[in-house]
């Protein structure tokens, strides 16, 4: 009988008997609980290309708490990156969403890149905020409460669309793109091309 993961619901369907060999497999999470299945991830990685993406919008604990009220602390997520990287699992940090005037500047991104590299992340990816109607209904009241000085900017940026226009998106991600080109990222994982 093939071994199945025991504790985590997401891992139950994963087979590690070789029948799914040579697959690319990834998991995106904010939760440090993924390390409960480190043995399964390591075993899967022997025959597959396993990558875990840990979402961290900010390494500043106060800002992170404002952005993600119920998410695990960013320091706990960075420790998760370290544990996965130490086990040889390719681990990427996702800075998502990047939000104008909130977490898009050097004061937010430089520490995130430094901490992600120090933790052993193979890369840092980012994506701009987008606001579909259901999200917009929750987002703007939150923005008025947390960042009232930015409400006008966001209303202009998202007045007639769910996604930022190309010029606004390019401006938003400019610092991220520059930092990602600095030495150290993306880094290859030993044993992989």
Residue ranges and their predicted role:
Residues 1-157, 161-164:
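Conserved AdoMet/S-adenosylmethionine-binding subsite of the radical SAM
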Residues 145-155, 159-193:
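C-terminal accessory extensions appended to soluble enzyme cores
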């Amino acid at each position: 009988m093939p071994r199945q993961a025991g504790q985590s619901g997401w891992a139950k369907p994963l087979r590690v008997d070789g029948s799914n060999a040579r697959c690319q497999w990834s998991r995106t999470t904010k939760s440090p609980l993924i390390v409960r299945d480190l043995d399964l991830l390591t075993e899967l990685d022997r025959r597959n290309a396993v990558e875990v993406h840990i979402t961290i919008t900010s390494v500043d604990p106060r800002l992170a708490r404002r952005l993600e009220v119920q998410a695990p602390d960013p320091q706990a997520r960075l420790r998760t990156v370290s544990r996965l990287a130490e086990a040889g699992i390719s681990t990427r940090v996702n800075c998502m969403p990047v939000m104008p005037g909130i977490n898009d500047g050097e004061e937010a991104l430089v520490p995130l890149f430094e901490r992600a590299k120090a933790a052993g992340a193979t890369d840092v990816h980012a994506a701009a905020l987008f606001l579909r109607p259901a999200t917009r209904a929750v987002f703007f009241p939150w923005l008025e409460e947390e960042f009232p000085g930015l409400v006008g900017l966001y209303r202009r940026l998202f007045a007639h669309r769910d996604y930022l226009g190309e010029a606004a998106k390019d401006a938003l991600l400019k610092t991220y793109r520059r930092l990602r080109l600095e030495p150290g990222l993306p880094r290859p994982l030993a044993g992989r091309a």
